[in-house]
């Protein structure tokens, strides 16, 4: 007879678990999550029947499934709401958009600008022809795919197709054409671009290794200890030379107050500093506002003067050249230059000027830029990645190992003797900063880059402003290369420096980079989808670009989540850079066009913002509490209220977007996985940029 366990159940009645319940955690009504679910314990089987246990488990499982379904429905609802909101925003921005072709055609400008518009339309027409051709070829390939023809069919296998009809004959001839005539030159061009790509990747890798070596060895420019200690102690024998501060500006009423307040609060003896506000504005309201700001600081005791040119030729270079011709400039030894949106900290001069002491070979000390709006939107985040690599790696490595780098045009201190020895500011290009740096290098002057001295500024927040800035930055170097190549060859600098200047500084980093980036990823890669006999390896399309993007993002580690958008956006910008490079190389009209980068007037971080606020309060107190606003301020406020924001529709980018998406469809038929995903996401990236859905809208 089987033993009875009733006595055991009675003795352990208080300690026996009757089964583990379902524990459900509810953070909010739309977010349910199950934490724990266990089957009844072994002891429960001793006191409860199997039938009750099965019923309870079924009920528990039903509740869990219902909760999971509720959570999934909540996620789908949230996703649908987000997509609907995104679609509404896209529709609203596109409805208010205007194409760049319409805008460029509507404006009446000089003959050079009209010629540039014609060349731009020609480039756009070529892209449209390429797009329509790809759509026709895609139709052929889809028809062939459903007929079951192999995309890699050889000549011998194609002979049986000749008698099947006109379409079969046309497709057969197309395959023979691409095998015998199109694939070989396309593969040759692809191989050439791959070689350029590898050379540029090697250059970037060497720069990164140089940066790692600098960090490992803790190498950085250090001024002589006595010059720093003299400045800190206020010794009468301290190195306190006469310093001229220049702020060139043109119709930049959003930022003039911040920059003027910043330079007027530089920590330097009042008798040894003079501030020049070089206003090239053609707007009377802006001129009045800047004059009033200068007059306010003059009342507060700052040595500041306002200059406005009658003859406004030469853009920024002409403005600086005119200011250097003033008679009192001969009394000054150094000149610090800041753009209108730059806000140096009070100790800027005390950190830069000491590097000149007892070293007559140093002609320039350049500080690093930092950005007050780097997290404003996706566009500013991607720009921050680029510029962080430029300063942390390129400028620092070239400074340490070569004593030469391109002057950034602002946040730098020049020895006036070096400027005069190099020929001063010239208006022959739109990159006057690079021009003077190259000429100073040819005359033997050395440069110092300070990675630990930062000067705050703004990044362009709209794609239109960023696009114009990049066009100027990439067309100017090609102009300069054509003009200064004979001088570089005839100069007395070493062969190694000539090689670095010609092949690395100009050709590789200014010409080859935008050329191969656009040609390889926007032209050759889509063509290889329709001419599969020419191939691009997967490591060229995916692995090496991903590695290079990883290296680029190292100086800005907080931006690591944006590595994929950064890679796609850089390829998207290759259209603008390639167009600018061609304009500068062949002296097209747009290469001579200077457009002031649009500013938003964002305040800097920390004490400077409080300082500006304090200065504004002081000004209001001086005017009187009941004093009315000036006429210029009223007009500026009225003009600001009239401004409306709109979108730009960029037709070239849209054409390339549809071209890449068409090529992605073709690669899907060939089952090329990596190529398909790259073309798909790159096409979407071009589509977003073409519809101006990245960055702020333009006023």
Curated annotation (Swiss-Prot):
Tissues expressing the protein: Mainly expressed in roots, flowers and seeds, and, at very low levels, in seedlings, leaves and stems.
GO terms under biological process: cell wall organization; plant organ development; pollen tube development
UniProt crosslink position (Glycyl lysine isopeptide (Lys-Gly) (interchain with G-Cter in ubiquitin)): 617, 620
Molecular function, one GO term: protein homodimerization activity
Topological relation to the membrane, as annotated: Multi-pass membrane protein
Location of this chain's protein in the cell: Golgi apparatus membrane
Keyword Glycosyltransferase tagged: yes
Record-annotated membrane-spanning stretches: 126-146, 194-214, 511-531, 536-556, 649-668, 674-694
Protein name according to UniProt: Probable xyloglucan glycosyltransferase 12
Organism whose genome encodes this protein: Arabidopsis thaliana
Organism phylogeny: Eukaryota, Viridiplantae, Streptophyta, Embryophyta, Tracheophyta
């Amino acid at each position: 007879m089987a033993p009875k366990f009733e006595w055991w159940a009675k003795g352990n009645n208080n300690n026996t678990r009757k089964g583990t319940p379902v524990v459900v955690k509810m953070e909010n009504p739309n977010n349910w999550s199950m934490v724990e679910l266990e089957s009844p314990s072994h002891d429960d089987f001793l006191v409860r029947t199997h039938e009750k246990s099965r019923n309870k488990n079924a009920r528990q499982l039903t509740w869990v499934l219902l909760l999971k379904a509720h959570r999934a429905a909540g996620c789908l609802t949230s996703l649908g709401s987000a997509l609907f909101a995104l679609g509404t925003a896209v529709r609203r921005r596109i409805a208010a958009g205007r194409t760049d072709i319409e805008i460029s055609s509507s404006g009446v400008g000089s003959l050079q600008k009209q010629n540039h518009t014609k060349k731009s339309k020609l480039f756009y027409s070529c892209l449209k022809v390429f797009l329509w051709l790809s759509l026709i070829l895609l139709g052929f390939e889809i028809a062939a795919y459903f007929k079951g023809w192999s995309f890699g069919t050889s000549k011998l296998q194609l002979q049986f197709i000749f008698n099947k009809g006109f379409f079969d004959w046309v497709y057969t001839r197309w395959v023979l054409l691409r095998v015998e005539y199109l694939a070989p030159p396309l593969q040759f061009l692809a191989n050439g671009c791959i070689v350029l790509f590898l050379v540029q990747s090697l250059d970037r890798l060497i720069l990164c290794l140089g940066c790692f070596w600098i960090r490992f060895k803790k190498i950085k420019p250090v001024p002589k200890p006595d010059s720093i200690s003299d400045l800190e102690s206020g010794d009468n024998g301290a190195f306190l030379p006469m310093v001229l501060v220049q702020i060139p500006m043109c119709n930049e009423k959003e930022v003039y107050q911040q920059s003027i307040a910043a330079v007027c609060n530089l920590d330097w003896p009042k008798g040894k500093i003079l501030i020049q506000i070089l206003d090239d504005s053609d707007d009377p309201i802006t001129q009045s506002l800047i004059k009033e700001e200068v007059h306010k600081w003059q009342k507060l005791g700052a040595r500041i003067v306002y200059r406005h040119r009658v003859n406004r030729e030469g853009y920024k270079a002409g403005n600086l050249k005119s200011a250097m011709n003033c008679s009192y400039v001969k009394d000054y030894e150094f000149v610090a230059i800041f753009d209108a949106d730059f806000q140096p900290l009070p100790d800027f001069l005390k950190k830069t000027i000491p590097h000149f002491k007892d070293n007559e070979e140093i002609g320039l000390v350049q500080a690093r830029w930092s950005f007050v709006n780097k997290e404003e939107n996706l566009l500013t985040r991607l720009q921050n990645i680029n510029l962080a690599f430029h300063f942390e790696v390129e400028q620092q490595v070239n400074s340490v190992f070569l004593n030469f780098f391109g002057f950034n045009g602002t946040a730098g201190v020049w020895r006036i003797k070096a400027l005069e020895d190099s020929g001063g500011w010239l208006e022959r290009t739109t990159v006057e900063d690079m021009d003077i740096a190259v000429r100073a290098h040819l005359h033997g002057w050395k440069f110092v880059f300070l990675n630990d001295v930062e000067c705050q500024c703004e990044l362009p927040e709209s794609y239109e402003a960023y696009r114009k800035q990049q066009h100027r930055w990439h067309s100017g170097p090609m102009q300069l290369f054509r003009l200064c190549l004979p001088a570089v060859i005839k100069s007395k600098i070493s062969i190694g420096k000539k090689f670095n200047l010609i092949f690395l500084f100009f050709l590789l980093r200014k010409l080859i980079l935008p050329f191969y980036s656009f040609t390889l990823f926007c032209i050759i890669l889509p063509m290889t989808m329709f001419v599969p006999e020419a191939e691009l390896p997967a490591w060229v399309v995916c692995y090496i670009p991903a590695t290079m993007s990883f290296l680029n993002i190292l100086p800005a580690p907080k931006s690591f989540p944006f590595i994929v958008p950064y890679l796609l956006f850089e390829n998207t910008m290759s259209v603008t850079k390639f167009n600018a490079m061609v304009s500068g190389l062949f002296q097209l009209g747009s290469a001579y066009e200077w457009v002031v980068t649009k500013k938003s007037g964002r305040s800097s971080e920390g004490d400077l913002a409080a300082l500006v606020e304090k200065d504004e309060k002081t000004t209001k107190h001086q005017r009187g509490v009941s004093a009315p606003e000036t006429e210029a301020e009223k007009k500026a406020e009225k003009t600001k209220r009239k401004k409306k924001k709109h979108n730009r529709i960029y037709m070239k980018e849209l054409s390339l977007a549809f071209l890449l998406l068409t090529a992605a469809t073709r690669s899907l038929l060939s089952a090329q996985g990596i190529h398909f995903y790259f073309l798909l996401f790159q096409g979407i990236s071009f589509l977003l940029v073409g519809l101006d859905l990245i960055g702020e809208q333009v006023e």
